[in-house]
Amino acid sequence: MKTTQYVARQPDDNGFIHYPETEHQVWNTLITRQLKVIEGRACQEYLDGIEQLGLPHERIPQLDEINRVLQATTGWRVARVPALIPFQTFFELLASQQFPVATFIRTPEELDYLQEPDIFHEIFGHCPLLTNPWFAEFTHTYGKLGLKASKEERVFLARLYWMTIEFGLVETDQGKRIYGGGILSSPKETVYSLSDEPLHQAFNPLEAMRTPYRIDILQPLYFVLPDLKRLFQLAQEDIMALVHEAMRLGLHAPLFPPKQAA
């Protein structure tokens, strides 16, 4: 597992996590900026979730505040985790309808991008759609499948997650909109993903699993769902059969240059 400079903050005896004022200011900067950027770009289901969560702007929310809404809508919860967790823990949490949230926030120096998922990425990027039953069901199914999968199978499942939950787009009557949390928590990628620069491809789970990606660049290709309900339908299909077919067919050639050694 990779290492990180970030350390998740621990709760006090009452379960309350104390963040310094500088970190609340980072949250305020991020959420204020991103709420403007996603206007006319985020899908309606995500915007409905944002409204339901009622995220504070002036401070980092406590996890209990998020849990009250998620449990009332879809039965999900968020679970406090360290900055990085192993695949096994990740799948165990999703399989028990718990979404991992690392209780740290990026430094002002990494305001625009960091490789580790921080509390802003997890709560602002992902939690709004966990109020949606279709999205929540797909995420739950994904966790249960990942828990039983082999190491090799998990690599292909990870690509499916990346191309949907993290970096997915969806077709709407108003045009393409964003539902992927990796895009919705990034001002640059929110604008870029809907531009003419990247490729847009109709969603096909087999193709998504065969598509290589890099985590440190703007994505060269985005898969577009016909609607969000497609994720719920996918949860009813034999995803592991698709994994095995993807393993048999192999990966497509990458649409990006190899990462330069540090």
UniProtKB/Swiss-Prot annotation:
Family from the record: Belongs to the biopterin-dependent aromatic amino acid hydroxylase family.
Residues given in the record as Fe cation binding sites: H121, H126, E166
Organism (species): Pseudomonas aeruginosa (strain ATCC 15692 / DSM 22644 / CIP 104116 / JCM 14847 / LMG 12228 / 1C / PRS 101 / PAO1)
Top-level taxon in the UniProt lineage: Bacteria
Pathway: Amino-acid degradation; L-phenylalanine degradation; acetoacetate and fumarate from L-phenylalanine: step 1/6
MF term (GO), any: iron ion binding
Keyword Metal-binding applies: yes
Pfam families on file: Biopterin_H (PF00351)
Cofactor dependency: Fe(2+)
Subunit annotation: Monomer.
InterPro entries: ArAA_hydroxylase, ArAA_hydroxylase_Fe/CU_BS, ArAA_hydroxylase_sf, Aro-AA_hydroxylase_C_sf, Aromatic-AA_hydroxylase_C, Phe-4-hydroxylase_mono
Gene Ontology BP, a term: L-phenylalanine catabolic process
Keywords (A to Z) from UniProt: Iron, Metal-binding, Monooxygenase, Oxidoreductase, Phenylalanine catabolism
Name of the molecule in the record: Phenylalanine-4-hydroxylase
EC number of this enzyme: 1.14.16.1
Catalytic EC class: oxidoreductase
Catalytic activity: (6R)-L-erythro-5,6,7,8-tetrahydrobiopterin + L-phenylalanine + O2 = (4aS,6R)-4a-hydroxy-L-erythro-5,6,7,8-tetrahydrobiopterin + L-tyrosine
Co-factor binding comment: Binds 1 Fe(2+) ion.
